[in-house]
C-alpha cells in the first residue's frame, strides 16, 4: 500500500533501533489504512462502478458483484500478508521465500485444475491464488508479526 511504502524507511530505522512500540504502531496503522481503503473502495466500486463506467461511455462492465467482492477479499488478504512480510524483511529475515515459491506452484496447479478440469472460468482465476495463499501465507506472516509485537509489548 502507499502508506506502508511511504513509511518503509521509518520501519527500517525502528527495526535497527529495536523500537517495537513504533513498529507495532506502524503495523496497526498500515493494516488499518489497508483494510479501510479496501472496504471503502470496494463498496464504492460494487455500488457505483458500473454507473461510473457508463458515465464515461465505456463499453465494459465490472465483474458481477459476488465475483468482485471475492476478488477484493483475495487481494486484501494478499496485501495484508505482504505488509506483514515487509515488516519481517525489515529485520533482515526472509522466511517467506520458499513458501512464496510453493504458493506460486500451488497457484499454477490450481489454475490448471480449476480451468481445465472443473471449467470454472473466471471463478477459477480468482479462487486459485486465493486458495493457494490461504493455506499458509495469508495467516502465517501476519500472525508471526502480531505474536512478535504482543510478546515484546508484554515482556
Task: Describe the role of every protein-language-model region.
Residues 18-22, 146-155:
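Interhelical loop/hinge segments that connect adjacent transmembrane helices in multipass membrane
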Residues 20-24, 46-76:
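Interfacial segments at transmembrane-helix termini and the short loops linking adjacent helices
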Residues 16-42:
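Membrane-water interface segments that mark the loop-to-transmembrane alpha-helix transition
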Residues 69, 73-100:
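Membrane-interface junctions at transmembrane-helix termini in multi-pass inner-membrane proteins
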Residues 1-18, 90:
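Helix-loop junctions and terminal segments of transmembrane helices
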Amino acid at each position: 500500500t502507499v502508506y506502508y511504502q511511504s513509511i518503509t524507511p521509518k520501519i527500517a530505522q525502528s527495526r535497527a533501533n529495536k523500537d517495537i512500540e513504533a513498529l507495532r504502531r506502524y503495523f496497526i496503522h498500515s493494516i488499518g489504512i489497508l483494510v479501510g481503503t479496501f472496504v471503502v473502495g470496494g463498496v464504492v466500486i460494487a455500488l457505483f462502478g458500473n454507473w461510473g463506467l457508463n458515465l464515461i461511455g465505456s463499453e465494459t462492465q465490472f465483474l458481477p458483484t459476488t465475483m468482485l467482492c471475492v476478488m477484493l477479499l483475495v487481494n486484501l488478504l494478499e496485501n495484508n500478508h505482504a505488509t506483514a512480510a515487509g515488516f519481517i524483511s525489515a529485520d533482515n529475515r526472509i522466511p517467506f521465500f520458499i513458501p512464496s515459491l510453493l504458493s506460486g506452484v500451488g497457484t499454477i496447479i490450481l489454475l490448471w485444475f480449476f480451468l481445465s478440469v472443473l471449467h470454472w472460468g473466471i471463478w477459477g482465476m480468482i479462487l486459485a491464488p486465493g486458495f493457494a495463499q490461504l493455506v499458509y501465507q495469508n495467516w502465517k506472516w501476519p500472525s508471526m508479526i502480531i505474536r512478535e509485537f504482543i510478546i515484546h509489548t508484554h515482556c
